[in-house]
Amino acid sequence: MATDQLGTGLPWVDAIAASFPQHSFDAFHAHELPALNAQHGTLITEDLAGVPALAFQLADGATYTWRATPTGVEAVNGDVGATTLVELDETTFSAFLNRLLSASGAVRTDRARLRRGTLDSWRRWEPAIQTLLTGMPIYTDAVRGVLVDREGRPLDLHQAFTADDDRDAMRHFFNVAGYLHIRGVYSSTEVASWGTEIEKVRAMTTPGDPFSWWSLNSTGAEIVTRINYLGRYSDALQELCTEPRMTEYARLAGPELRVCDDRLDGPMVFIKNSDVVKGDGDLGWHVDDGIGGHPVMCPLIQAGIQLDNANAANGQLMVLAGSHRYTKHPIQWGQEGELPLVKLDTEPGDLTLHFGDIMHSTPPPTAPNAGRRVLYYKFAEEKTFEWIPAGCHYNDALFRADAAGKVSSRAATH
């Protein structure tokens, strides 16, 4: 799979990190962590009950072990009893606390090393750590109690709106549930025209294109599953960045949001294929800031113009309702339990919107000849444009050398 490789070459992680608090490793554990635990510890006691201890260690040997307690968490010197031992530097530790790097992002970019334990055992602690820092609760099936309309009644999580519906009702649903489905926004003529443009772009995209994702099917054939920066090949698809209906609905999440027409992969298309056996043609449960960058990119809105039927057979978007307002554990397909899983069935001309940090997924189509196409346009706040230059993505920063020379190959955005 190939994806964006261009960028400014600047050490973005260092520049962005300097805009956030720098945490002294010793002072954080001695003073800040106890204070945070006094504020928010009760939010994590149930989640951490019985979870093995986690330790962080600097290169000079300074080490603190985090242990679950009946009142939250405590940190003690040394690594005795720690099932997981993470080695990192003070800059990376700060970036992790500031959510500029996730546990996954820190390991994948070689900014942290697991001396003991696994990435999963570090990630097991991650929602609780984020909750300590922010006061945001951890996502569980208890969310169903707050997925309510303006009168306090349970939301119909499968509700589809129309262009004639009340904007305040739509805004409330969007902000509470984290997604929105609006039927019939675009005409069949518009959909057909954009579909023709997509096929033109697809014909011009070849394996090795740094702005596209490629997968393999069971015959070994390479198939394109995502094409970024569509304006390279299509003026019409680039001009859609300023399409007023999409802009109006995206701004239900915030009037200051701007379309990312020239960064964060720009206008893009997802193409679902059947029989994908390797690559990112099918995406498990993820968030768009999964390797880091939450305060830089979020709130991030993904606006999807549906060009084909979306359902289990042809491929569809799934979301975990309300999860954008919580810290959350990684999960796999089949582990959703009683969480409010919503499968969005859509038709050509529909518009879907979702927050980038809602848990979402696009599972394999069940039909043998799937071909769903959906155009995506991102919307973000001004801060995102100030930090991320044109032609670049936050992930590019993570996968380029920083001041210490740490670098890794660019990976997918989830």
Task: Tell me the role of every PLM-derived stretch.
Residues E248-P255, K278-D345, F385-H393:
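Catalytic core of non-heme Fe(II) oxygenases with the double-stranded beta-helix
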Residues V107, R113-L114, H181, L353, ...:
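Hydrophobic beta-strand signal
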Residues T327, I358-H414:
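Non-heme Fe(II)/2-oxoglutarate
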Residues E151-V176, R183-L283, R400, V407-S408:
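Non-heme Fe(II)-dependent double-stranded beta-helix
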Residues A2-D165:
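Feature captures hydrophobic
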Residues T346-H360:
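Conserved metal-binding segment of the jelly-roll/cupin
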